[in-house]
Regions:
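Hydrophobic alpha-helical segments
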Residues: 748-824
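Short linear, low-complexity motifs centered on an aromatic residue
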Residues: 193-208, 423-436, 644-651, 747-759
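Structured, mid-chain assembly/scaffold modules that mediate subunit interfaces
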Residues: 143-242, 417, 447-456, 460, ...
Length: 824
């Protein structure tokens, strides 16, 4: 830059600039010159040299002004976020004090005392609204056979349409349009909270990179496979010139290191991934720009291991989490959270020196919860250990939980108990329940999904019973298939939809007849008033035109009814899109929290307790996950409903809640127990008499908050197989115990001349590991026609002894005797 230019710039800046600042300005001008030439070559050629320089300098000036304004705005947003948090923390009256208040800003707490929409609930509500707008995209990939496969032609057409290439496929075009609209909405909401994601016209869709597949090839191989698929115009030097092959290869080499190591090359000294200003996310994530749809698809085939739908959902979940974090804690959430944590911890410890230990423990729990929610987890230590552990756990889900539907009747108890506490109309809930249970009613399903309800099946989640997964595999497919084939997924979704629809209808009716939030009766609407709903949210809700869904649901307050409010009607309350989006999310967040209370789905707190926060690919992490396999659901039931009970305003209310919970779920557990016996070929048990205590203990274990412990403590597997300790340590430990016992028994049986006993033990082991063999509507037939006959072949008299033991120890007879191939 010439000296007179430097003087002019310094005069405009009203200060002396450093050599580095001057160089940056010069680079920015040259970069903009090349950017203009690349994007609009026709106009560029018609400009004189001075006009080109002026245009580029003008753009550079605008960029600098915009960056300065963004920096200033981020400071203001950080101050505003800190003020909101300080106000909530200082006004919180709970026994867990200010540290407890900070903890509640991170994840949902069921006791009804928070009055704050947590990061977890904000994330879920944002994600579920985004998913609700993507029905066309979901249909375009044509998920078949329980949603486990995607149609290749549909995927190809959708990717082409997302990249702006016409395919003539109307479904794919609508799906791509919906995707563009919802991702752009989320981009705007992120930027409104202080983010800085620019609009990239031909972005289309994010990429997924398989750490294992990329790590399995050399850096040179990966770079050579990728470099020819890229749109080179996006790869420029600092001065705006296009990178040459060597420079681009070096750039891609750094990307390779990050992908192949799972981020190990970007760790802090604590082992956590580096995380700067979260509001800057979105710029770095678009570093690989494919030149067209074919290049994208070819790359995903070579180095991806997820379906298109999983990639789309992953993007929505990621940006939803970022939005929730920057809205709650400001553009640099890590900094604000840690400064608050340090301050509150110091204040609490100073005020209560004798409780320093408990303060430290709560502070550590709070920090761990924040790290888990914000995704600041350690990379996978050993992908092979993690993958094998996943496969074992998924296989056990597929082979052991085929009858889990029969253990799920306790959902009815928690659902109606939650409805009572939330003041929902019971009769309407029952009507909606019947409608949702009708598998032929596609209208009900489409409406509920459009309202953002029960999105778990769209996510392909088996989270209710299983754990987190490394990625797609045969075992994961088998687990998902069994969950869907058993009817458990449909059961859970239907009841979630019924509860959510009832709550939205009830809220619509309450909003229409109540002038403002303060007019709500505290005793009837205590839970609703604990959701952090503001007067502005209530005012926006009243402006929404409610929907009539029929079947008594004629006052539906839905997310779409809020987002359809004309901008002119809410502009007096603030920026229209922001005001409507926040009111919509408060509605969906409140409903989602209560739906997950009514039909339990483990949340962040429960997942952290069951080992999800421990590093994957380590023996400690995988063993912990294995011990807690199947236990996340019963733990969630106990944690959430105990917390809700303890949050009741009076001692009488607490006692009544606990008594109702135990009584209702135990009675439904008894029903589950009887149905499970019938499905296994046994007659219903006597519920009275000398064995009554044993029966009702089993009912309590099966339904009354201890859930699947009943399956392990009182099931066939435990009665005749593994010991109670192995069962308590989880099904993986039980499997190891079975294998060890068989191995020990082989030489013993040979010495005693009972080698056929080993065959019988192997049959029993094989049956327990066969996916789908435990499906509630198949297991009696499979047992009697195949497995029992094999057992009798290897161990003559085994079935007779089993029948005698059942009569002696459990006073139980059979309607389909074990030795009969067909019922007699």
């Amino acid at each position: 830059m010439r000296q007179e230019c430097i003087q002019a710039v310094q005069q405009a800046a009203q200060r002396t600039l450093t050599a580095r600042e001057i160089q940056n300005i010069e680079d920015r001008i040259y970069r903009n010159m090349r950017s203009i030439a690349r994007d609009d070559p026709m106009s560029w050629r018609q400009l004189s040299e001075s006009e080109r320089l002026y245009r580029a300098a003008q753009l550079a000036s605008e960029e600098l002004q915009r960056e300065a304004a963004l920096k200033k705005r981020r400071v203001a947003l950080t101050i505003a976020a800190r003020q909101r948090l300080d106000k909530f923390i200082n006004s919180y009256q709970g026994a867990d004090g200010k540290l407890g208040a900070l903890n509640r800003t991170i994840a949902f707490n069921a006791d009804g005392k928070s009055n704050f929409l947590s990061v977890e609930s904000r994330t879920k509500a944002t994600r579920d609204y985004a998913l609700s707008q993507l029905q066309e995209a979901f249909e375009a990939v044509d998920p078949r056979f329980f949603g486990l496969f995607e149609d290749e032609a549909g995927v190809r057409d959708l990717v082409y349409e997302m990249r702006g290439q016409n395919t003539g496929n109307a479904k794919a075009r609508k799906g791509a349009k919906a995707w563009r609209e919802v991702t752009d909405l989320l981009r705007r909401r992120f930027n409104d909270a202080g983010g800085d994601i620019g609009y990239l016209e031909n972005w289309g869709i994010p990429q997924h990179h398989s750490m294992e597949k990329v790590g399995a090839v050399s850096k040179d191989k990966w770079v050579s496979d990728v470099i020819g698929k890229l749109d080179r115009k996006y790869y420029t030097r600092a001065d705006g010139q296009l990178m040459n092959d060597a420079e681009l290869s070096a750039f891609l080499g750094e990307a390779y290191n990050t992908i192949a190591t799972g981020g190990l090359n970007k760790l802090t000294d604590t082992g956590m991934r580096i995380s700067g200003v979260r509001a800057n996310r979105g710029n770095a994530s678009r570093q690989i720009h494919f030149k067209d749809a074919d290049s994208y698809l070819q790359y995903q085939q070579l180095y991806g291991d997820r379906s298109l739908w999983e990639i789309m959902v992953g993007h929505l979940e990621g940006i939803s989490k970022d939005i929730a974090l920057v809205e709650t804690y400001g553009p640099n959430p890590d900094h604000v959270f840690r400064s608050l944590l340090d301050q509150v911890k110091a204040e609490t410890a100073t005020a209560n020196p004798s409780k320093t230990g408990s303060v430290e423990r709560l502070a550590n729990k709070t920090e761990n919860l924040y790290n888990f929610i914000s995704g600041k987890t350690q990379p996978v230590a050993n992908p092979h250990i993690a993958r094998w552990s996943d496969n074992i756990r998924n296989w056990l889900v597929a082979s052991r939980l085929g009858s889990a539907l029969l253990s799920s009747f306790s959902d009815l108890g928690t659902m109606y108990l939650s409805a009572k506490v939330t003041n929902l109309p019971m009769n309407q809930l029952f009507r909606n329940q019947l409608e949702a249970m009708d598998p032929t009613n596609r209208t009900e399903l489409a409406r509920a999904r459009r309202a953002g309800l029960a999105m778990e099946s769209l996510l392909g989640s088996v989270n209710r019973w299983a754990m987190d997964n490394m990625g797609p595999s045969v075992s994961r497919w088998a687990a998902t298939a069994v969950m869907r084939a058993s009817g458990l997924t449909a059961w859970s979704d239907a009841h979630k939809r019924a509860y959510g629809v009832t709550m939205m209808g009830s809220l619509g009716e309450v909003v229409s007849r109540t002038p403002d939030l303060r007019s709500l009766d505290d005793s009837d609407f205590r839970i609703l008033k604990s959701k952090g709903i503001t007067d502005t949210d209530w005012s926006v809700w009243k402006l929404a035109q409610q929907e009539d869904w029929g079947n008594g649901n004629n006052t539906m307050l839905t997310p779409e009814s809020i987002m359809r409010i004309p901008d002119s009607a809410v502009k007096h309350l603030g920026e229209p899109e922001r005001v409507k989006f926040e009111a919509m999310r408060q509605l969906l967040g409140a409903v989602t929290e209560e739906v997950d209370m009514a039909v339990i789905t483990p949340g962040a707190r429960e997942q952290l307790i069951t080992g999800s926060g421990i590093q994957r690919g380590t023996w400690k992490g995988e063993l912990t996950r294995s011990v807690f396999l199947f236990k996340s659901f019963p733990i969630s039931v106990v944690m959430r409903h105990w917390s809700r009970a303890m949050g009741m305003p009076s001692a009488g209310g607490r006692a009544a809640y606990i008594a109702t919970f135990i009584a209702s779920t135990t009675i439904l557990g008894a029903l589950s127990q009887q149905l499970n016996d019938l499905a296994s070929g046994r007659n219903p048990r006597e519920m009275t008499g000398e064995d009554a205590a044993k029966f009702w203990l089993g009912a309590l274990l099966k339904g009354g908050g201890l859930g699947l412990y009943g399956d392990f403590l009182l099931s066939d597997h435990t009665r005749y197989g593994s010991g109670a300790l192995a069962s308590m340590l989880g099904p993986v430990a039980g499997l190891v115990d079975d294998v060890v016992k068989i191995a020990q028994g082989i030489p013993l049986n040979a010495v005693e001349g009972k080698s056929e006993q080993t065959g019988g033990d192997l049959v029993k082991l094989g049956k327990g590991l066969m996916p789908g063999a435990n499906l509630w509507y198949l297991k009696a037939a499979l047992d009697h026609m195949i497995f029992n006959q094999m057992q009798e072949y290897f161990s003559p008299g085994y079935l007779r002894k089993m029948e005698q033991r059942s009569k002696k120890e459990f006073n139980q007879t059979y309607w389909w005797r074990p030795q009969d191939v067909t019922p007699q």
